[in-house]
Amino acid sequence: MALPNPHGPEKKLMPLFLEGEAREAEIARAASLPKVYMTSMETSDILMLGMGAFTPLKGFMNKAEWQGCVFDLKLPDGTMWPMPVTLSISAAELEASGIKEGSDVALIDRESGELYATMNIEEIYQIDKMAQAKEVFKTDDAEGHPGVAKTFAQGEYNLGGPIKALNEGKYHEIYPKYYLYPAQTRALFESKGWSRVVAFQTRNPMHRSHEYLVKFALESGFVDGAMIHAIVGALKAGDIPGETRVKCYEALVDNYFPRENIALAVYPMEMRYGGPREALLHAVFRQNFGCRYLIVGRDHAGVGSYYGPFDAQTIFDELWPGALELGPMKINWTFYCYKCESMASLMTCPHGKEDRVIVSGTQFRRAMQEGAELPKEFGRPEVLAILEEYYRTAEKVEIKKHAYEDLTPEMLAKIKEGKK
């Protein structure tokens, strides 16, 4: 059996990074182009587009693509796509730049000032941000939901069109062993003889329930390999830095998994906290990375109490035949059971809640930050030792993230103007 095809009608990876002389020539040309400044999420989307993880997208969405994605989960050609990938600009910046439809522009990361891509603007359009929030995030609560807050903080206009990606960022230097493009993970899987790979999405150090989910998948008989795939894009307050988390993953993989059945990789996307919709996005690009299954457990990609614990599982049931080649591996509540003397789930354990230790990522981080002594059922000692060392020197931050924490003063002003 072969690996699943990349997503989209052409069934081939479509990386957008230029290389060699073409790249150098485009960088030189970009110096004379009008500049459009990007948020950290837009910059991370450039990296995902560049490596081919967002295949079959050729750039930032035009209005028809945005509308189909938001309201129907489809691009105009019928390809399933669950979340917007858009570039916005304020009315003031648009007027000052003189940019028009047909213009070529240089895309600059607002924080670093670095050039990341060039873009041909095929369309300048406005969107209904309230409709996007309600359709994609199922809420318009900009004060509590970080994805909604960022939606309302976007500029008044979107720019749609193809890009030429020029800057691969610095993740290669930070994670030289694990920062892999879809073509590279596919080659890795093939070298191991894997064709039925399951992906595990994580932005936290892995506690015992996480470990159990991956092992449960490996023991299911449906898969021949697993990839722990960690997000290392921009973090929010209370999150543990990627470098520390990677040390935790290494300790877990080295001590508790057979290396012939496990792979570890990282990717640069910024979390959207889209719950069910984001679970579908995770599935799309995991298919591009070569995976046939995605573990979808409790509250996948959620935040707060905006989604039911298993909404991210049931949304896959709403898809039409052929929407994805990847399938969800749906797993119920997992916990440590003292009577079973092992990790278990509602499918395997008959005992009551008084016998169970249910571990959540928030509980795990808060206990570590406060220096609380954790029972062995929470995490492996090698992982806990790394985290204890990190928290001894880390600045104390509030674990619960406010939706506005990543936003600039200009973005906050837009929200306070009335969610325009």
From Swiss-Prot:
Sorted UniProt keywords: ATP-binding, Nucleotide-binding, Nucleotidyltransferase, Transferase
Keyword Lyase tagged: no
Domain of life: Bacteria
E.C. number(s) listed in UniProt: 2.7.7.4
Any Pfam family: ATP-sulfurylase
Recorded GO MF terms: ATP binding; sulfate adenylyltransferase (ATP) activity
Family: Belongs to the sulfate adenylyltransferase family.
Catalytic activity: sulfate + ATP + H(+) = adenosine 5'-phosphosulfate + diphosphate
Enzyme superclass (EC): transferase
GO biological process, one term: hydrogen sulfide biosynthetic process
Keyword Nucleotidyltransferase annotated: yes
InterPro entries in the cross-refs: ATP-Sase_PUA-like_dom, PUA-like_sf, Rossmann-like_a/b/a_fold, SO4_adenylyltransferase_pro, Sulfurylase_cat_dom, Sulphate_adenylyltransferase
Pathway per the UniProt entry: Sulfur metabolism; hydrogen sulfide biosynthesis; sulfite from sulfate: step 1/3
CDD domains xref list: ATPS (cd00517)
Official protein name in the record: Sulfate adenylyltransferase
